[in-house]
A protein has these predicted regions:
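Bacterial N-terminal signal peptides
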Residues: 7-16
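Beta-propeller domains
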Residues: 82-93
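Boundary at the C-terminal end of the N-terminal hydrophobic targeting segment
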Residues: 18-21, 27
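Conserved beta-propeller blade signature
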Residues: 77-79, 88, 122-124, 166-168, ...
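Short loop/turn segments that connect beta-strands within beta-propeller blades
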Residues: 91-94, 136-139, 180-183, 224-228, ...
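Extracytoplasmic beta-rich repeat domains
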Residues: 28-30, 37-40, 52, 59-72, ...
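Structural signature of WD-repeat beta-propellers
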Residues: 82, 127, 171-172, 215-216, ...
Length: 402
């Protein structure tokens, strides 16, 4: 691959920095949300700045279907699959369909991922029968397919390397596969003892790129991105399907048993863990990182926030419904004269159909919207817009109020 072309791809679409030994920048670019959690490290952070209040830019309903995935966005196009097997490219400006693909006897429960290489303009997505497809971004033509033996529950992660972009994808057949982006050919496969339901995330370290999988086998797996060899496996509270969020030497995630953990992957040990609440409400939301805080949704109908350093609870905000969708952190400012200027805030949606923007430091409500239909997946932020898809088949798009 041409070195200049790869460098441009890195700058435009990924959170990677020039030197592989440096930590991953923890924010998606302001004009794109290229994968499920926005960044290679799974931080759920956007570099965008939104001005509140938001207002509906458009919404579009699709009959006899539901959405369970986070939209991904680049170059003014939204890519999103539904649970009844239609994968669509929609215009960010107005929701108009640019192309669509119908899978036979399959659905799309997880987010797609958009190629960071303009010379290989593909969007990658897995379905609930275990098939991973690569579509031409512009036309929807299928470029290649790769088959696994289990549902693809977590969105693929696209990792730029000196040898080309790699597709990392986990399957409920217990495997993590590394594929060549251009043709889908497998480069390595790593299997664990139980299902993989999360998206792989990546930390760039002095020892090389490390891939993290939080598995249904009750372990966090640390895997060498170049070879697929396991570097460590750390026992956790129990099974989990949530995607870890990585920063520095730590990854953060919750479990089905209701515990929340920070794992030091260099030491291969827990840095801290919170005990499950008395109700043992599971975490199916993936965490987002905001400065020194970790923000996550809970099945206990709340948004919870912990100090990244020691796990101390910072704040907890009750919600009307379960929060299985993952928060997105973005800087926001308000229109009031007393507004202190841009501050990090979390965009969160619940199963009762409520979308809120909460101050990341305090949990204070900054904005809210009642969509009616519930949400099982989180939002995407790009180009000044917030896009989220509901269980009732509606795609919503919000922008700064005129």
């Amino acid at each position: 691959m041409n070195g200049l072309r790869l460098s441009a791809a890195l700058l435009c679409f990924t959170t990677a920095v020039a030197a592989a030994a440096e930590p991953v920048v923890d924010a998606a670019p302001a004009d794109a949300w290229p994968m499920a959690r926005g960044t290679l490290a799974g931080t759920g952070r956007s570099a965008a700045l939104l001005t509140l209040p938001l207002a509906e830019a458009w919404h579009r309903g699709f009959e006899k279907t539901a959405f369970g995935a986070v939209p991904v966005i680049a170059d003014g196009v939204i890519y999103l699959g539904d649970l009844d097997g239609t994968f669509r490219a929609l215009a960010l400006a107005d929701g108009a369909t640019k192309w669509s693909f119908k899978a036979e006897a399959a659905g799309f429960p997880s987010a797609a991922a958009i190629s960071p290489d303009p010379a290989v303009p593909l969007v990658i997505v897995g379905d609930d029968t275990g098939v991973v497809r690569a579509f031409d971004k512009a036309t929807g033509e299928v470029a290649w397919e790769y088959e696994t033996d289990g549902e693809i529950s977590g969105g693929p992660t696209l990792l730029p390397t000196a040898a080309g972009v790699r597709v990392l994808v986990g399957s409920q057949d217990t495997s993590l596969s590394c594929l060549n982006l251009a043709d889908g050919k497998p480069l390595w496969k790593h299997s664990i003892a139980d299902q993989i339901r999360c998206s792989p995330v990546v930390a760039r370290t002095a020892a090389g790129d490390r891939v993290f999988i939080a598995g249904c086998d009750g372990k966090l797996h640390v895997i060498d991105a170049a070879t697929g060899a396991e570097q460590a496996a750390v026992s956790i509270d129990g099974p989990t399907g949530t995607t870890p969020a990585a920063r520095g030497d730590r990854v953060f995630f919750g479990t089905e048993g209701g515990g929340f953990l920070a794992i030091d992957f260099v030491q291969a040990a827990a840095a801290w863990r919170t005990p499950p609440a008395a109700t043992k409400q599971a975490y199916r939301s993936s965490a987002a990182l905001a400065d020194d805080l970790v923000i996550v949704g809970s099945r206990g109908r709340a948004v919870e926030t912990f100090a990244a350093a020691d796990g101390r609870r910072a704040w907890r905000r009750p919600m009307r419904g379960r929060v299985d969708g993952s928060p997105v952190v973005v800087d926001v400012s308000g229109s009031a004269a007393a507004d202190p200027g841009p501050r990090p805030a979390a965009i969160v949606a619940d199963a009762a159909g409520k979308i809120v923007v909460l101050d990341a430091a305090t949990g204070e409500l900054r904005w809210e919207f009642d969509a009616g239909g519930g949400f099982s997946a989180g939002a995407a932020v790009a180009a000044g817009r917030v896009v989220i898809a509901a269980d009732d088949g509606t795609v919503w798009c919000f922008a700064t109020a005129p």
